């Protein structure tokens, strides 16, 4: 252990064996006693900062510390007035990119908060594809009756009908196309660019 270091404060001034001069008012020793603890940061009462809640005061406090007046109690848990930021409506809004109405599904343009998109703080809209395009028209459903089959029968009952049905006419053979260019010496020469 360092013999010069003493963990317990002796209350006496430091030894100054080398005679180092300190400026006037420099504390060369420990104070006699630490100042008493005060629960308030500022000594004395400050009218700008209310010391606490009086019984029966509403739970919200004024944003400006210059007045002691407290805004009236509101049963809403939202501390901001209604005009500060938009409130999500229960009705779907028309998508700004889909100009027609009716056939287009309406769903709000939802932007993911920045912490959802990793490694970037850019807020990117991710509600686009379903709202931009019209719903697909499904193809007509088959009615369950096979071609050449009598309705209301099973496959075994109509096997003869299936086998004797007229097969479609064969497609005519495709016309033969000549090769695009006969392999020969090209009729042009390569001219290098002039720049």
Curated annotation (Swiss-Prot):
The keyword DNA repair does not apply. The keyword Acyltransferase does not apply. It is a multi-pass membrane protein. InterPro entries: FAM168A/MANI (IPR029247). Pfam families: TCRP1 (PF14944). Keywords: Cell membrane, Cell projection, Cytoplasm, Membrane, Transmembrane, Transmembrane helix. GO terms for cellular component: axon; perinuclear region of cytoplasm; plasma membrane. Inhibitor of neuronal axonal outgrowth. Belongs to the FAM168 family. This is Myelin-associated neurite-outgrowth inhibitor. The gene is fam168b.
């Amino acid at each position: 252990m360092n013999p010069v270091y003493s963990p317990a404060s002796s209350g006496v001034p430091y030894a100054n064996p080398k005679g180092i001069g300190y400026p006037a008012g420099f504390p060369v020793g420990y104070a006699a006693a630490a100042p008493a603890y005060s629960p308030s940061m500022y000594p004395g009462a400050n009218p700008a900062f209310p010391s606490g809640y009086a019984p029966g005061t509403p739970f919200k406090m004024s944003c400006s510390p210059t007045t002691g007046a407290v805004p009236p109690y509101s049963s809403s848990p939202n501390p901001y007035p209604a005009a500060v930021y938009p409130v999500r409506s229960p009705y779907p809004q028309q998508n700004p990119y889909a100009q027609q109405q009716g056939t287009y599904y309406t769903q709000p343009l939802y932007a993911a908060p920045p912490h959802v998109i990793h490694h970037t703080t850019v807020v990117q809209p991710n509600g686009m594809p379903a709202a931009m395009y019209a719903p697909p028209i499904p193809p007509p459903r088959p009615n369950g009756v096979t071609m050449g089959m009598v309705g209301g029968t099973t496959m075994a009952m109509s096997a003869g009908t299936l086998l004797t049905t007229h097969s479609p006419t064969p497609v005519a053979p495709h016309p033969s196309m000549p090769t695009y260019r006969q392999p020969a010496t090209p009729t042009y020469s390569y001219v290098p660019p002039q720049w």
